[in-house]
Amino acid sequence: MSKKPVLNLDTSNGFSEEYISHPERNDNQGIVEITDLVFSSESKLTQRKESRDSKTFVPSFLEELDDDHLHELVTNGGILYMNSLGEGVSGSVRKCRIRGTQMIFAMKTVLAAPNTALQKQLLRELKINRSCTSPYIVKYYGACYNNAECQLNIAMEYCGAGSLDAIYKRVRSQGGRTGERPLGKIAFGVLSGLSYLHDRKIIHRDIKPSNILLTSKGQVKLCDFGVSGELVNSLAGTFTGTSYYMAPERISGGSYTISSDIWSLGLTLMEVALNRFPFPPEGSPPPMPIELLSYIINMPPPLLPQEPGIKWSKSFQHFLCVCLDKDKTRRPGPQKMLTHPWVKAFERIHVDMEEFLRQVWSD
């Protein structure tokens, strides 16, 4: 199997060597490292008018959708369901197109027992998501219930490069490693999204690789935020379990704060860097779920090790240590973390995320 190439970063950018990692060339490692930032805006969707003989509402653009219009499209067969984007315990996500148009979006379908009070509560929480307008937040277009199928449908922005979870597992399957430069851009994007949410008094609550999406141009976006997991479980009549990305204070039953999202970000970045979940140490026998939660609470936080052919910068290692501080009072919020030297460096360093993603998904 061919290995992913290593592209060297032009270090004539004025930043100290302390802030940049320079993985040594090692064909056996197959490290993925790309340069030059390209953050192009997403191409605007072509506006289309409703057909005269159509009785179903057809929007001119996706932002024109609302809950009622989405319900009409779902009920009257106005949506073409394309390929699956992901499956979970309580639902799925599919790529969709509005019939008669080229408008593409993602539809999340969640199991939903017929409980009117819970349905109304969840729709209220989802309206908060719709009000968010940030390049680092996935756009939400509308939500509706299909009581005949016991489903909640949520229409949202389609991100062509997929989730960080899918991206790093694709790199791993090809014998590669995701390098520090793409991780730096991802960290900046996630922190920018969290900072935006924090300004609006919203805590994400579920930062993990599958909830960090990237467009084909490399724009980082957060999804699935601000909605109570307990509410979703109650509505679906299921229990999806405790997320292993939860901060220790949350696993222990303590309150959730914005710094809890920072722990989850640190764990996510370390997982992608290592190509595996950081707990327990490599070589340990697979733990039972309750054992893993106990390990996260009671054992020291993981450290990012240096490996043959891979040199992580001291600044990146320090960033992860700050994120994974078990004392939540010492763990900063997203605005403070945006000032960390490692993140500040990657705010300006050019990393061609579009090319990185093209290589990841090329055959």
UniProtKB/Swiss-Prot annotation:
Active-site residues per Swiss-Prot or TrEMBL entry: D206 (proton acceptor)
Phosphoserine: residues carrying this PTM: S234
Activation and inhibition: Activated by mkh1.
Keywords, ordered alphabetically: ATP-binding, Kinase, Nucleotide-binding, Phosphoprotein, Serine/threonine-protein kinase, Transferase, Tyrosine-protein kinase
Record domain Protein kinase: where: 79-343
PANTHER family, alphabetized: DUAL SPECIFICITY MITOGEN-ACTIVATED PROTEIN KINASE KINASE DSOR1-LIKE PROTEIN (PTHR47448), MITOGEN-ACTIVATED PROTEIN KINASE KINAE MKK2 (PTHR47448:SF5)
Name by which UniProt lists this protein: MAP kinase kinase skh1/pek1
Natural source organism: Schizosaccharomyces pombe (strain 972 / ATCC 24843) (Fission yeast)
